[in-house]
Amino acid sequence: MSIAYPFTAIVGQDDMKRALTIAAVDPGIGGVLVLGERGTGKSTTIRALAALLPKIDVVSGCSYQCDPLAPRPGLCAQCGKPADTPDSKAMTIPVVDLPLGSTEDRVVGALDIERALVNGEKAFQPGLLAQANRGFLYVDEVNLLEDHIVDALLDVAASGENVVEREGLSVRHPAQFVLVGSGNPEEGELRPQLQDRFGLSVDVRTPGDVPTRVEIIRLREAFDHDRTAFRKKWARKESALRRKIQVARDQLDDVDTPAVLLETAAKLCLALGTDGLRGELTLVRSARALAALEGKSAATLKHLRAMAPSVLRHRLRRDPLDESSADIRVERVIAELFQESVNDGGN
């Protein structure tokens, strides 16, 4: 098993690290889209997140990591049968890679050919979506995915379950995961339907100052020289951040959401002309998750403002009369609205 680079040793890229951490605190936010040029640490940072994720209880022997305490209707066919409380075990939240060249059978699952040939029985071979249930599904170069794979992801993302009907099989199982995608926008555009499914979006850039670049090189060389020793050196910081994420997850439901926060989120999305209400809902949830991560009892306008660019930049319609970037448009409206909030006595 390869040794991953420590998350806390990554220099800069604060927006990306914050977005991934927020998604770990509240998986319901809807995933993270990371776009940027090659060599900016996108894949390294995303894979480093796996070591920070807490453990969850799963039904022993279940191929879908079903929650032993969840209501029966939300479980797989085997775990959903009436019975006593099933045996359970603890496991780290899974992070599953979806390779670019994966077939649809590998992604959604298919007939278990070996069992069919050896035993003459029709059995389902779970795919990557099953492995990612209650965890993270990572797609590198997500903007280059084939259309039929994108369609499968969209169907599952909308329903939270995977339905496979083929080769005489009819299988339905839970498939709720945090979708994390990375890619270089210069190599191809992401389909709007899939882009809208990401709760947060981050643009990463190559560091433009010499000290930062030197520090990145120094740390990377130290890691490549002795990976075990390097991880041991950063173990304390990794452990501290892991505990911080776990505490935030535990306290998330207790974080208050003031009325002014809801009103400001609605005004912001209305002013930017975002479609539907997904923007407001995600903005409020991410502000609350950030407050929980900071150990606060209530989300404030400061948290809302901090998360607004990541939540809204990929939801804007293209305006032929405004050539400004999405970030500039979001920041412009934020500045106007938050000045109003200050004048009205908001915090």
Locate each region found by the language model.
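C-terminal engagement/docking regions of AAA+ P-loop ATPases
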Residues: A266-R278, A289-N347
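Conserved AAA+ ATPase small/helical "lid" subdomain
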Residues: T228-L283
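Conserved ASCE/P-loop NTPase catalytic core
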Residues: M1-G208
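Hydrophobic/basic alpha-helical segments enriched in Actinobacteria
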Residues: I56-D57, T85, K89, L98, ...
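Alpha-helix N-cap/helix-initiation sites
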Residues: Q13, V210, P258-A259, D275-L281, ...
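A general alpha-helix detector
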Residues: P6, R197, K244-A248, T264-L268, ...
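Non-catalytic alpha-helical coupling and interface elements of nucleotide-dependent molecular machines
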Residues: V25, I29-G30, A50-V58, D112-I113, ...
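Conserved AAA+ ATPase core "coupling" helix
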Residues: E104-G109, L190-R249
